[in-house]
Amino acid sequence: MHLFIIAGHGAGDPGATGNGYTEAERVRALASRIGALGGSNVTIADTSRNWYADNGISSLNIPKDYQIIELHMDSASASARGGHVIINGKYKADQYDNALAKMISGIFPGRSQIVVGRTDLANPKRAAAKGYPYRLMECGFITSATDVKIFNSRMDDIARGILQAFGLSAVGTSTSTKTETAGKIYRVQVGAFKSKANAEKLASELKSKGYQAIII
């Protein structure tokens, strides 16, 4: 199991704002914690980009079994609260969607519908066209002082909850019945190229030597 985390908005788009924060900054902070706690089981998509505006998913090249989660925060009146998961409305929620929805609505209660199917959003459609499993998670309302306080104080709980929804453990813990050797996990990122051809050349060289390589 491997997670591919997209932090919503960015690249000059702050997203929703409220209580002294921007959506883009907060979900990037959460993405960072998911990456830190998830170790080699997590890839954080380039946070300098706006993956909606630049149509990033359509040019994405990752293994088809990677699970994509796009992180957002809701915006409405100051009294609106709650977290939920959005999926492509043409499909049924899977076990991961339901586990995420149960987790996030437990931390951010208030929504009557915790899994919502939408057919009008670009990224769910782009992911489906590429054959990638995808869901968008709204982590409470940035316009709610209560939700923002919970988000900030329980960020690691949210990050761990996301990992656990996919059967993954945070680094340094294990829910598996198998005995594994404890130790640090080191990740290596090789190269950044302006030319896609050069990136593809290096990826091919790494794959020929038996290494897993992806271009993001």
Segments predicted by a language model, with ranges:
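Catalytic-core regions of hydrolytic enzymes
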Residues: 1-95
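Hydrophobic anchor at the start of a short beta-strand
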Residues: 40-43, 66-68, 111-113, 134, ...
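Solvent-exposed beta-strand motifs enriched in subsets of small alpha/beta binding domains
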Residues: 6-8, 173-216
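Catalytic cores of processing enzymes, dominated by hydrolases/peptidases
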Residues: 89-141, 182, 186, 197
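Long, well-ordered alpha-helical scaffolding segments within enzyme catalytic domains
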Residues: 25-37, 92-110, 147-174
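Active-site-adjacent mobile loop/cap segments within catalytic or ligand-binding domains
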Residues: 4-6, 59-63, 68-73, 77-80, ...
